[in-house]
Amino acid sequence: MPQTFTSIAKIGDYILRTPALAKVVVPIAHQFINLSGYRKMGLRFDDLIEEENELAQTALRRLPADESYARIYRIINAHQLSLSHHLLPKDKWTKPEDDIPYLTPYLLEAEAFVKEKEELDNLEVAK
């Protein structure tokens, strides 16, 4: 079964609501984020979402223009840093409080729209 953004969000909410799971998983997640290094290149987590699928394209079209331009700038800057094998200075790294999901709400909205459309397309009228 392929993972959907909705199922991933529900799993994350469940983990955060369960104290025992949160106590174990959250520190591991923070360490994973630190080791992945995307914040050291000025990226935010939603910048890493694959944009080659229809759902992501829909979410990107719904993104406000200023956020879209900022996203493109961060990605281009990260590519340049990658090509030159450098990282940003520590004061320019993305801070955890700045790494908020800006694309995820649009992805969830687009996914709900696709699901609703599919349900309506397959609707059978009973008499």
UniProtKB/Swiss-Prot annotation:
Keyword field: Electron transport, Membrane, Mitochondrion, Mitochondrion inner membrane, Respiratory chain, Transport
Membrane topology recorded in Swiss-Prot or TrEMBL: Peripheral membrane protein
Cysteine disulfide partners in this protein: none
Any single GO CC term annotated in Swiss-Prot or TrEMBL for this entry: mitochondrial inner membrane
Subcellular location: Mitochondrion inner membrane
Any Gene Ontology biological process: mitochondrial electron transport, ubiquinol to cytochrome c
Domain of life: Eukaryota
InterPro entries: QCR7, QCR7_sf
Leader sequence residues: none
Alphabetical list of Pfam families matching this protein: UCR_14kD
Reported function: Component of the ubiquinol-cytochrome c oxidoreductase, a multisubunit transmembrane complex that is part of the mitochondrial electron transport chain which drives oxidative phosphorylation.
Entry similarity comment: Belongs to the UQCRB/QCR7 family.
Subunit-structure text: Component of the ubiquinol-cytochrome c oxidoreductase (cytochrome b-c1 complex, complex III, CIII), a multisubunit enzyme composed of 3 respiratory subunits cytochrome b, cytochrome c1 and Rieske protein, 2 core protein subunits, and additional low-molecular weight protein subunits. The complex exists as an obligatory dimer and forms supercomplexes (SCs) in the inner mitochondrial membrane with cytochrome c oxidase (complex IV, CIV).
Protein name: Cytochrome b-c1 complex subunit 7
Organism whose genome encodes this protein: Kluyveromyces lactis (strain ATCC 8585 / CBS 2359 / DSM 70799 / NBRC 1267 / NRRL Y-1140 / WM37)
